[in-house]
Regions:
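Short, charged/small-residue-rich alpha-helical element at the C-terminal edge
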Residues: 221-293
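ABC transporter nucleotide-binding domains
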Residues: 4-5, 12-183, 188-202, 208
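Conserved beta-strand-loop-alpha-helix hinge in the C-terminal portion
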Residues: 205-227
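Active-site phosphate/pyrophosphate- and oxyanion-stabilizing loops and adjacent acidic/basic residues
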Residues: 96, 213, 234
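Short loop/helix-cap segments at secondary-structure boundaries that form the rim of catalytic
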Residues: 71, 216, 235-236
Length: 302
């Protein structure tokens, strides 16, 4: 299967700042690929490079197995900056201008307005739109022509919970039709909800990339309590399959390196004379994994 996007060893420096540092990624057809990281991690610079808005200092990238060019650009829709349309024109008229720029006919305008939930407001002037509606109109403009790839840079930034939910619904709907979506975001919860794959960046360096499901399945977390907490704590710290242990309000959180069941834990404690009073399983969130990756990176920095 040919990758939709292949990035190989891309770097971009602004003076002494390493915006992107030797980055390599692969995005395959149909993936919802999240590029996750704090502000200044290189997300927007990476997207700007692959959209040919910024030139990399080194490295290469390909779209659809070929070097980038006019034909590949026609297959990509993107929203990189804040929505910017003519304020006194309606949503439909603004999209007609975008269609003219893209050399497309107007047949697709009603479809993208319906996808983004703006069809009933198609004859409303842009200046009266809320910020969330403006963001949705920007996505509608990117969807004109039904591109194979949709690129969104911080699509929910600055939105209220309702606006975030609207954008999430649009992303999931577009993805369900087979469109490959690449999203840059610092909102871990939203990435976890919509993305199938994720790459974690920090200060221009990739810390991780892979399936979101794999991230969430690593190191099962269990909450444990016992009638003898001292004995339980000793047991947890001597267990070779436990990665880390935290204690809060008399309850221990244990992260296991390998897959383990509650029955395994209960039996192990019982054999060693420990009676558990509390045992529950908690899946590791993307946020936990993200923070651990950043902590590991900081520990490695001289």
């Amino acid at each position: 299967m040919t990758n939709v996007l292949s990035i190989s060893g891309i770097s971009k420096h602004y003076g002494k700042i390493h915006a992107v540092n030797d980055l390599s990624l692969e995005v395959q057809p149909g993936q919802v690929f999240g590029i996750l990281g704090p502000n200044g991690s290189g997300k927007t610079t990476t997207l700007s490079i692959v959209l040919e808005l910024v030139r990399a200092d080194s490295g290469t990238f390909q779209w659809f197995g070929e070097h980038p060019g006019k034909e590949s650009r026609k297959r990509i829709g993107s929203v990189i900056e804040s929505p910017n349309f003519f304020p006194y024109l309606t949503a439909a008229l603004n999209l007609k201008i975008v269609a003219d720029i893209k050399e497309m006919d107007y047949d697709d305008i009603d479809r993208v307005l319906k996808v983004t939930g703006l069809y009933e407001r198609r004859n409303t002037r842009f200046r009266t739109f809320s910020f969330g509606m403006k963001q949705r109109l920007a996505i509608a403009s990117a969807l004109l022509g039904n591109p194979e790839v949709l690129i969104l840079d911080e699509p929910t930034n600055g939105l209220d919970p309702q606006g975030i939910a609207h954008i999430r619904e649009i992303i999931l709907q577009v993805a369900s039709q087979g469109t490959t979506i690449i999203i840059a975001s610092h909102l871990l919860d939203e990435v976890q909800k919509v993305c199938s794959h994720v790459a974690v960046l920090n200060k221009g360096t990739k810390l991780f990339d892979g399936k979101v499901s794999e991230v969430l399945s690593v190191s099962d977390c269990f909450e444990l309590g016992a009638s003898d907490p001292v004995a339980l704590e000793k047991w947890l710290h001597t267990h070779t399959d436990i990665e880390s242990v935290e204690k809060k309000n008399g309850i221990f959180q244990a992260f296991f390196k390998a897959r383990i069941t509650p029955a395994d834990i209960n039996n192990g404690c019982f054999r060693d004379g420990i009676t558990l009073t509390h045992l529950s399983e908690r899946k590791r969130s993307l946020e936990q994994h993200f923070l651990e990756l950043l902590e590991e990176k900081n520990d490695q920095t001289p």
